[in-house]
Amino acid sequence: MAKSQIALCCMSHSPLLNLPGPAQELLDEIDKAIAAARDFVAEFDPELVVTFSPDHYNGFFYRAMPPFCIGTAAEGVGDYGTHEGPLDVPSDLATDCARAVLDHDVDVALSAAMDVDHGTVQPLQKLFGDATAKPVIPVFINSVATPLGPIRRVRALGAAVGAHLATLGKRVLVIGSGGLSHDPPVPTLATAPPAALDRIVRGVPMTTDQRQARQTAVIEAAREFASGRGTLAPLNPDWDRAFLDIVDSGRLAEVDGWDNGWIAEQAGNSAHEVRTWIAAFAALAAQGEYVTENRFYRAAPELIAGFAIRTAVTT
């Protein structure tokens, strides 16, 4: 069997891309960058997609919070107007991937009924128009629910997935979804009120009113943040650019020593979503040296995020 061809697209996500508030100029600039990534993906024409993505207490909860999980079946929950319903997950390929990762000494959970949110489906919809357009293996990386594992294990996960993908004889696109610096209003075990605690621990479904209230709160938090008010940690463009330089230049081993507390202190609690980028780039790097092509970055307070996009192929 011929060796697989692997390509990469990493991009930030934001529910605010689908909500009122951001300036049209900002949305137009991001749409232009996404269009370039979409053209890259269309030209590559993947036969299989592997997503590395976080969750925002929509599919994974403290009742059992794995560091990593591979889905053999998955459904979008439809949050913030994103895709609701099943994804096209090839269960046999996903199971084989999980088995290969375990054989590479990386402990990964398996889900035969994974729920995924905008962190997974928004990039699929932006790149393909439809979240079900391509067969996809979803890989969850806990990036929110502390305590978090060491970054070096994320790189090991990506490398193990990449080593397996190389054996499939397919054109495979790996997607990393999230980041960069940002600190949105996310409940924690220490601070969540009772209703939110029931959700993040037990997965108690949100009512329609609760979902609407959360959406309104996110819009208001972004409005305050963009105007320089509120209590959210500021974006850190310098940190973002330093991280992008690391992935652009293939110096992935440098992240192995990063301290989790340092990441949150420098770039916000949800900056840990860069774990998805690290895993995706590690999967690509398992094929050899690579070069990044489409490069976009903008600090976007209106999205409460340092918003970035990268595409890459092996050389």
Curated annotation (Swiss-Prot):
One of its GO terms (molecular function) is ferrous iron binding. Keywords: Aromatic hydrocarbons catabolism, Dioxygenase, Iron, Oxidoreductase. Gene3D superfamilies: LigB-like (3.40.830.10). The active site is at residues 118, 182. Pathway: Aromatic compound metabolism; 3-phenylpropanoate degradation. InterPro entries: DHPP/DHXA_dioxygenase, Xdiol_dOase_suB. It comes from the Bacteria. One of its GO terms (biological process) is 3-phenylpropionate catabolic process. Its cofactor is Fe(2+). Its EC number is 1.13.11.16. It catalyses: 3-(2,3-dihydroxyphenyl)propanoate + O2 = (2Z,4E)-2-hydroxy-6-oxonona-2,4-dienedioate + H(+); (2E)-3-(2,3-dihydroxyphenyl)prop-2-enoate + O2 = (2Z,4E,7E)-2-hydroxy-6-oxonona-2,4,7-trienedioate + H(+). Homotetramer. Catalyzes the non-heme iron(II)-dependent oxidative cleavage of 2,3-dihydroxyphenylpropionic acid and 2,3-dihydroxicinnamic acid into 2-hydroxy-6-ketononadienedioate and 2-hydroxy-6-ketononatrienedioate, respectively. Belongs to the LigB/MhpB extradiol dioxygenase family. This is 2,3-dihydroxyphenylpropionate/2,3-dihydroxicinnamic acid 1,2-dioxygenase. The lineage of its organism: Bacteria, Bacillati, Actinomycetota, Actinomycetes, Mycobacteriales.
